[in-house]
Amino acid sequence: GVLNLGIGGNCVVRGGLGPTALERFDRDILSQSNVRWLIILEGINDIGSAKTQEEADKIAAELIAAYDEMINKAHAKGILVYGATILPFAGSFYDTPYRQTARDTVNEWIRNSRQFDAVIDFDKIMRNPDDVKTILTDMHDGDFLHPNQAGYRRMGENVNLGLFK
């Protein structure tokens, strides 16, 4: 089976709705039986909370440290961890140059750190080729941030199911 333990409006390390992903990681992931794989797709709300470039840089570093902590804990339990890049958000209420820089920093780390067992590049799958900082026009729900039904379908259809064998 599949467990989706994402919470709308949640953050990895600070604020957001409900306990942070890092706070609930042991309970939500490590305490579950027979977990073999984990996809981490979280961080946009942390980045969206930044009010300055300095804060955005700090949040990017905190996200990377939190991902690293979750990866290490999961690996210690024999769980394969797949990192998913953060979707484009230009045109949304989160769109500022410093938040874009933080997203780019985090996505670069997800893609190139070699900490994850594999990377699911949702950024690449969902971005507009004519403006790579924006989500494809017909793939969001009107806010340039959240995928719509077609967007989620596109994301799902582009996950390599061979990762789960």
Regions inferred by a protein language model and the residue ranges of each:
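Surface-exposed amphipathic alpha-helices with a cationic face
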Residues: 67-75
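Conserved beta-strand segments of the P-loop GTPase G domain that flank and frequently precede/overlap
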Residues: 41, 84-85
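Extracytoplasmic/cell-surface-exposed regions of Actinobacterial cell-envelope-associated
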Residues: 2-4, 64, 78, 105, ...
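Loop/turn elements at helix/coil->beta-strand transitions in domains of secreted/extracellular proteins
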Residues: 1-2, 33-38, 76-82, 114-118
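Catalytic His-Asp segment of secreted/periplasmic serine-dependent ester chemistry enzymes
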Residues: 22, 48, 86-165
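Surface-exposed charge patches
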Residues: 27, 72, 108
